Amino acid sequence: MTLTQRLVHYEKLMRLDKPIGILLLLWPTLWGLWLAAEGVPRLDILLIFVLGTVLMRSAGCVVNDYADRNFDGHVERTRTRPLALGAVSTREALLLAAGLSLVAFLLIQPLNRLTIELSFVALFLAASYPFTKRFFAMPQAYLGIAFSFGIPMAFAAQTGEVPFPAWFLMGANLLWVIAYDTEYAMVDKVDDLRIGIKTSAITFGRFDVVGVVLCHMAFLAGMVAIGLLQNLGVIYYIGLATALGLILYQYRLIHDRDRARCFKAFLHNNWVGATIFAGIVLDYLVRAAS
């Protein structure tokens, strides 16, 4: 295998060719950073968190594929992943995950002690999540904690503390993660039932679509509460109203449980996150200019 071919397999293992996971992890982290900084985050902290998100999401994908290496070959969507094909060895995968995590840890060294301490929890969550699919009926909830942990870290980095709104925002985001990752799990539901993997789509059963909608609605209600806690203005709520419209469109996509349309709905959540972020940024900019 040539070096170029090996690098392509590493790229696929880290999902750099499919950045949706990075974006879904990045948006709530940016929400938290902007709210903590009241619209003016420090540039160095912003850069560290953007790069750290890319590194840790990549490491998480490598660990996920390592954990699922004996299952992925039996699932239509994942059978061509590098570990499932044997194109990358388990030793290479573990070394790659460790290297990415080390670089991410070195990246946050300029930040305060609380942020560094929280990073150990974030690392544990990212590394342990893939194994929860073997025994936990709702692994998407665990993923929600892992994918939301950039929020308290952002508050800690910017303010030196993690106040109540940070934890509340984390809880709201957890519901969003359950919603969109259930859509993702609906794509593989038949295969997961056959091989014994546990997911929220299986746990919800015939109420999977209802579960997605309820989690999305609870998420938006939580974001309304965040707006009240942070004294955000009308532009923020316009952003939330737009996000509601996007979510209603997702319901149209998933109601018949077609695999391709469920996957499209999952991808569509990027626009939900981006819209809410735009609402936060613009709200602070307008208030600063007035």
Swiss-Prot record:
Swiss-Prot/TrEMBL keywords: Cell inner membrane, Cell membrane, Magnesium, Membrane, Transferase, Transmembrane, Transmembrane helix, Ubiquinone biosynthesis
Cleaved signal peptide residues: none
Keyword S-adenosyl-L-methionine found: no
UniProt cross-references to Pfam families, sorted A to Z: UbiA
Molecular functions (GO terms): 4-hydroxybenzoate polyprenyltransferase activity
Compartment list: Cell inner membrane
Gene3D superfamilies: UbiA prenyltransferase
Pathway: Cofactor biosynthesis; ubiquinone biosynthesis
Main localization, broad class: membrane
Summary of the function given for this chain in its UniProt record: Catalyzes the prenylation of para-hydroxybenzoate (PHB) with an all-trans polyprenyl group. Mediates the second step in the final reaction sequence of ubiquinone-8 (UQ-8) biosynthesis, which is the condensation of the polyisoprenoid side chain with PHB, generating the first membrane-bound Q intermediate 3-octaprenyl-4-hydroxybenzoate.
Cofactor requirements of the protein: Mg(2+)
Top EC category: transferase
NCBIfam families cross-referenced by the UniProt entry: ubiA_proteo (TIGR01474)
Cellular component, GO, one term: plasma membrane
InterPro entries xrefs: HB_polyprenyltransferase-like (IPR006370), Prenyltransferase (IPR039653), UbiA_prenyltransferase (IPR000537), UbiA_prenylTrfase_CS (IPR030470), UbiA_sf (IPR044878)
Mode of membrane association: Multi-pass membrane protein
Residue intervals passing through the bilayer: 20-40, 43-63, 92-112, 114-131, 135-155, 160-180, 209-229, 231-251, 266-286
Name of the protein: 4-hydroxybenzoate octaprenyltransferase
Biological processes, Gene Ontology terms: ubiquinone biosynthetic process
Lineage: Bacteria, Pseudomonadati, Pseudomonadota, Betaproteobacteria, Nitrosomonadales
Catalyzed reactions: all-trans-octaprenyl diphosphate + 4-hydroxybenzoate = 4-hydroxy-3-(all-trans-octaprenyl)benzoate + diphosphate
EC number: 2.5.1.39
UniProt record similarity statement: Belongs to the UbiA prenyltransferase family.
Source organism, top-level taxon: Bacteria
The gene coding this protein: ubiA
